[in-house]
Amino acid sequence: MRISTLLAFVAVFSAGVAATAPAVAADAACRFLPIADSAVPLQHTQKVAVLFSENTLNTQQYLERYHAVAVKGAQNPGLDSRISQAFVDSSDPQRAIGWLMTSLQKEFAAVTVYDNLDAALQAHPDVVVMLDTYSRLVSKRNDQVEARFMARFYDSNLQYIGQAQGSRAEQMPSVWVHGKAAPQIAAQINQQTVLQVNALKQFDASLKTLVTAGRVDHVASN
């Protein structure tokens, strides 16, 4: 990478993309504390209420800030377009949430997001889901990339049914050094997207297993 391109790269992303990764919320803020496990099986016919955990809300804010810097950086003529586009693509703040909601919609009859628990319970859902997500992307001060997705399922009395999850973590080689070609840097940054998608696919498999197990248990009990 040319010195001029490297300087543009550092100038654009050092400040904005060095944004602090979201802090991990206390465990109690990301789950309900049931008295007992639920005997309610998960089924395709159920109506599901979704709540976002504190981790999910913090992660969304982090991704939106990161993405805004990436989009602004893409307008810098001194920055190779392959690099800037890789940052834009890998920081899409809607990718994970959109994927997770689609996954739930494939497995249940109705899926609705609510702002708070009271609103969710007033809708009388069959199942309540706490969606807990965490993402961390590469920055000048961080080379550890993470993507964690978890959905905890509870019955209408907030007793625990089970959970689906997917996660990936990887330490990336530094992209902030002179001598690397732009295609190599872009490819490294694009690995963030690959990591996120692999974690989401793992979540899908886990969710399908959980719902299938619930259906089998329901049939066996009849």
Regions found by a protein language model. Name each.
Residues M1-F9:
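Bacterial N-terminal signal peptides that target proteins for export
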Residues A25-Q43, N157-N222:
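C-terminal/domain-edge helix-coil "capping" segments
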Residues F52, L100-F108, T112, L200, ...:
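Sec/Tat-exported extracytoplasmic proteins
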